[in-house]
């Protein structure tokens, strides 16, 4: 055995742009302290546990921003889901435990907060997840909030084949999600379960869910185990548990977004209809979670009775959410996986690669960093490989072959990001990370998560700004200059995050390279400049056209004035003067010239408008 212990973390990053510094102004307002204390000591009697509040803790940090971060902490039955925090230090919430600064980040940045939520060991979710961490970075200078939710798997110490199974399931389920969901968001999850029926008792019938049936078909094909029914049931339960956790973090993300936009921290009602989270399997738990969110929206939004009566499917819940949702995007990045492997025997990574002299270590590296070798990447669902064939493939790899060994070493050096006395750190193009360590230190994991969070948040911002640019390009080009300003600001924000990454700045740089962030930003800047230049020229043409029209009108008036002065007309002989051949010639020539000028202008303007419409349709 090469490993003493292995951990798997799934990271989902988010970012929130603030229109004003309302959030940061509220966090410094000490008038709210009495409201906070009163509000949460009321909940103490519902939860039958004391809630300790420390004025200095609230004053010196942004902890009170989190006081209503998750209103379901006071809901009925929540104590069956999460472990309550019992600590000698004051805690703001019963279930959110703040990670100390010296653990969460080596530079003790005051703008960063890390919270840990532990799953109750008696809950069915504990079979799959130990809990999750919430990483929050408040950047007042750039008016932004970014962060990640890090789900930690519950893994028992097993052999390589069992570890391979866990890694394969992780790859497969996230590949499945990526192929069926273009983003991780509350609405996307609701849409996946959209045709799931709700019976007359208000219970969600997951057996009617086509999305879950699709997953079960994939699993049955890819994992033909000898104890098929037992293993398939466990993998299906993991699928349900993962979506319960995703719904939880999407709900938390939604609440944080509202905190950033609301003018009052304490205007929400705690959920009274929260379904008891007591279920003996994750499928029933998932159904309860969907119903809980339905209750939450019904109580916290101005939903009519007619709206509630029309809820017959999960899709109808989604319609309510969409109808009463905020305008700002509420999405999480697609999953990044961090594998942390603690070695069985201490290694000296800086001077040798003895660790990879073991074939088991080589295979572990390949299946985590090069899953495509075994068909565990995006092609896993399309091809005919299954876990049994992969295990047979393991045995066929001959690392004594010089070519195979050289290829392995090249891949190892290519993906190596950091080498120290106690750690080897690798990252592949999918931003999946393998950290091989002698001693499992939480600070190492936190620093890795922070670095990936920074890089993915920049990409999320770039995508959001790109969508805003495309919208303004067609609807209001006058806003392109403001788009250019915020996009240029991304460069400085990227440098700021790189400096915040400290010793892991190489990991941050590598992640940016894999995601092609700099290229995306530069291409977007060129595109915005090009469109702004076109819009500028279009405005110049409009002004020029107006100038020409004004000149033409003025010229025509002057022309007739001139003609009138040279005509041989007198007041006494007006009738005879009109019939004078010389006057008729002057008037005819002038009329022809004016008509020719007007026709030329009309043809020119019509042609320009026609070409403008053609270009507009082509761009769309």
Curated annotation (Swiss-Prot):
Compartments in which it is found: Cell membrane
Listed InterPro entries: MPN337 (IPR054979)
Its membrane topology: Multi-pass membrane protein
Membrane spanning stretches: 66-86, 238-258, 546-566, 584-604
GO CC entries: plasma membrane
Keywords of this entry: Cell membrane, Membrane, Transmembrane, Transmembrane helix
NCBIfam families assigned: MPN337 (NF045749), MPN338 (NF045750)
Protein name (record): Uncharacterized protein MG241
UniProt source species: Mycoplasma genitalium (strain ATCC 33530 / DSM 19775 / NCTC 10195 / G37)
